[in-house]
Design a protein with these regions (language model features):
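Catalytic core and acceptor-binding pocket of nucleotide-sugar-dependent glycosyltransferases
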Residues: 153-173
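Structural recognition of the beta-strand scaffold that forms the well-ordered cores
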Residues: 57, 124-126, 146
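Substrate-binding rim/cap in mid-to-C-terminal beta-strand-loop elements of soluble/periplasmic
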Residues: 136-158
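GT-A fold catalytic core of metal-dependent nucleotide-sugar glycosyltransferases
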Residues: 81-129, 133-139
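Conserved interaction-surface patches within small, structured recognition/assembly domains
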Residues: 68-82
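Short, charged, amphipathic alpha-helices and their helix-cap/turn boundaries
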Residues: 58-72, 106-111, 115, 153-156
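Short, solvent-exposed loop/turn segments at secondary-structure junctions
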Residues: 31-34, 61-64, 103-106, 130-132, ...
Length: 173
């Protein structure tokens, strides 16, 4: 099911359809040692289905090429919390598609770019129907997120994450 959040007036819909496009970039992050064979096969799967996309699998060193220095609060954070911050910051700055490393594709990702161009959405994502109690506010999964650069929604999420989640830690939030 497709959701458009908020009550958009016609002039807002026009602006949305002029939104910047999601670039054909797939982002992922792997912390620590080399990825195990299963994860390496997932990365190969992405390249096989999407030869025209830039597939960027980052580690603790290469992530700095795209984001510069990371917040001090991430130095001792869990790999999960670190990846959560990195995914939002990459999408906020550069746009693209975030996939968790263990994601196996069954088709090319062109549909994501096409869907965003049709809808003008700030974010393409899956939601958890099981936990969504109000259809106006679905619980969005973060293993797959796609956004244009400077997405207002992603910027808001990243601001909340940086200024609330990081100081409290994942469990405290």
């Amino acid at each position: 099911q497709e959701y458009l959040f908020g009550s958009r007036r016609p002039d807002e819909r026009d602006r949305a359809h002029n939104a910047r496009a999601i670039p054909p970039i797939v982002w992922a992050y792997w912390s620590g040692a080399a990825a195990p064979p299963l994860i390496a096969r997932c990365f190969a799967n992405w390249r096989q289905f999407n030869p025209h996309f830039s597939i960027r699998v980052l580690d603790d060193d290469s992530v700095r090429n795209y984001l510069g220095e990371l917040p001090e609060a991430l130095e001792h954070a869990s790999a999960t919390l670190r990846a959560d911050w990195i995914r939002l910051e990459l999408l906020r700055r550069h746009g693209g598609i975030w996939l968790d490393a263990s994601t196996l594709l069954t088709a090319p990702l062109d549909w994501v770019l096409q869907q965003q161009q049709r809808s003008g959405s700030d974010l393409i994502a899956y939601y958890l129907d099981r936990y969504t109690t109000d259809a106006q506010f679905p619980i969005v999964e973060n293993w797959f997120l796609a956004a244009p650069p400077q997405s207002a929604l992603v910027a808001d999420l990243q601001h909340e994450f940086t200024h609330t989640v990081l100081p409290l830690g994942g469990a405290g939030y």
